[in-house]
Structures are given as structure tokens and as C-alpha cells.
Amino acid sequence: MPRQTRLQKFMEILRQQRPTLAEQYNVATLEVFGSYVRHEQRKNSDFDILVTFSKPPSLFKFVRLENQLSDLLGVKVDLVMKDSLKPAIGKHILREVVPV
């Protein structure tokens, strides 16, 4: 059986945590993008997650979620709200997202 890639491992952890994240933080969707999706990550790369919420969080709760995800995955997470994407960069991000 082939060894799981870090991306696959992270995706599995996120899938398992989705119900809890939905309950605690009102997370509606999670999608990943960036260097891990392109298989260009380096040792110090962060893990980029695009998130939508069923109810917008406070800044404190958003940062707490980002920190909790970093702790769960064991790598720095860069959490981006889908609603806040700027059109110029957003179209590039949306081309490579992988839903969790």
C-alpha cells in the first residue's frame, strides 16, 4: 500500500474534524489551495485553507480556528475567508482549490 502524502493526511484530518468545526465555528466549507495542492511545498510552507462560514465569526474566533487547525495538522495554517478574496488573486486561487 503506498504511503499517504502529507496533503492526503491533512485532508483526512480535516474531513474527520468537519462536524466539530461546523459546530464550534460555523464552518460551512473547507477547501485547500496553494503549494501543497500544486505539490510544490517546502519544509517551511504553510497550509492554505479557504473557508466559508454559515455565520460570520468574530476576529477572535477566526484566529482561534486558524490556531486550532495549525495545532491539529502540525503545520502553520493560513486560513482565508472565501468571501474576502480579491478578484485579481481570487480567480487564481479558485482554479486550484480542492474541496475537503
Across the structure, where does each feature detected by a protein language model lie?
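Catalytic core of pol beta-like nucleotidyltransferases
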Residues: 1-29, 37-43, 53-100
